[in-house]
Amino acid sequence: MSVKVSEYMTKKVVTVSKDNTVKDVIKLLKETGHNSFPVVENGKLIGIVSVHDIVGKDDNEKVENVMTKRKDMVVTTPDANIMDVGRIMFRTGFSKLPVVDEENNLVGIISNMDVIRSQIEKTTPKKLENIIKTYKSLGYNLRVEKEEVDVNKLRPTQNKIHADELVGRMYELKKGLAEPIIAIKTKRGDYYILVDGHHRAVAAYKMGVPKLDAYVIYLDTDKKLGIEKTAEIMNLKSLEDVKIVDSDDENSVKVIKYNKNGVLG
């Protein structure tokens, strides 16, 4: 089943009108950090204005005189396949596209980051499905919730991670591209057993990110799980206990420090 644009597009779009001026657009550029804005009239898309359109233009020039008109624009629809849209963006060089309905009403905007995020997140459900299947086969009653969890309440079950992958996860966190982790919550205490996503969790811990998106499997039990017992044998109580291994030599552990920007220190 294909992923639709509507599942990942931003619905609250910053727009301008044809009567706004270049000065107004410059102000919005500074306030939002965006590099282009759809131009709407009564909810209908009539054009788009970008930073390239206003370079060298008089501050008082009207947007309608510098914008790219609707007939010359590339747009997409909510029910379009997000990967097809990604290919269009790659070929045209656009970093984002307006999303319109059948009557040309602007209903959202989709960016290349949204396309990437859709592909990252789709890998998680299969892992989750396998973990759920395992615990159901062991006779546990469970439910699954997608929520934010406190990074400091995560208990690792893996004693080492790789330095190069950690840097990659730090980058993803900064860009908002990290997929949700998978954790288990029992009735034993106020903590979460980290099952999948150790690089992401340690990256968040090192960067001072307080919460992470997670699929939490709630098990209806107060018994200590096997993976908890294994973690105790490895003396894993918090993310601080996870060793960062130089990927060139998995058998040697270097002390590697990171600042909040993910830079080696």
UniProtKB/Swiss-Prot annotation:
Pfam families from the UniProt entry: CBS, ParBc
InterPro entries in the record: CBS_dom, CBS_dom_sf, Diverse_CBS-Domain, ParB/Sulfiredoxin_dom, ParB/Sulfiredoxin_sf, UCP004699_CBS/ParB
Presence of the UniProt keyword Repeat in the record: yes
Alphabetical keyword list: CBS domain, Repeat
Residue ranges of every copy of the CBS domain listed in the record: 9-64, 67-126
Protein's UniProt keywords contain Repeat: yes
Coiled-coil stretches noted in the UniProt entry, renumbered to this chain: none
Superkingdom of source: Archaea
Name recorded for this polypeptide: Uncharacterized protein MJ0188
